[in-house]
Amino acid sequence: MTTTADPKTAVPLVRLTDAGKNYGNIIALQGVTLEVGGSEVTCVLGDNGAGKSTLIKIIAGLHQHTHGTYEVEGEPVQFASPREALDRGIATVYQDLAVVPLMPVWRNFFLGNEIRKGPAMDIAAMRRTAKQELLDMGIDLRDVDQPIGTLSGGERQCVAIARAVHFGARVLILDEPTAALGVKQSGVVLRYIIQAKERGLGVIFITHNPHHAYPVGDRFLILKRGRSLGYWKKDEVSMAELTGLMAGGSELEELTHELEQAGGEGSGLREVAQVFEQEVAELHVAELGAGRTPPSEGTDTRQGPTEP
């Protein structure tokens, strides 16, 4: 009889401990710790320039870390290429998706990995497989022969996720998959992130939107200027706290005061100041309602992954 390891007690699929990356004398990433296990979603949040892209490149094998450790299933690694990461089951779905808009869905699904029957492509098998794999992810397209460019942004993201899963991904790195999508299409992508999680995959979800991260995430890492502001499990942080840290917290209040002081110069500035005042007030109310003291910016009281 075979037994399946409990994902809560198994060795994480990916773990970084105190990882960093220097480009010469420039520190791009410093002291970052995270992990993702099977059937888990780890969300990495940060504004532009926070270090999210550098982190992705380290995990995906594009760049090598210069400090700390990077482990895959407990084994220290330092990938020399994305192919090495892919061979270990780590696949990245980038924002540009690497699809050809005028080609049909099934052709994009197998692009570069075509099924062959002798010297020719086995088109029937590729159509059939693409259709079934998409259905398994809950994606029911009208016709896999339609050009992928006719799909919505959310549907294209989901095809890319299903493609990565089909070709052996055990860890999915999703590079801001909801960044350019509306509310409805973002919901579609979040639904398929949950589908991937339920199939036992580990997901690293890169985003700048805590409202997208919190409903699907199990762990949360916030980056700012290449450093970690904190690393929490879901029961250790609230949506309000994540939003406050992402919004800048004290920086937002300082901006509010600056706008108030400049408000006498025009009604437009006064209106902007009022909006910021309302946002700051809502954050404070939400934090008090959560019954906890919000984590202070720059203080990481839970830097390392806690043992079960």
Predicted regions and their residues:
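Long, low-complexity, intrinsically disordered segments
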Residues: 286-308
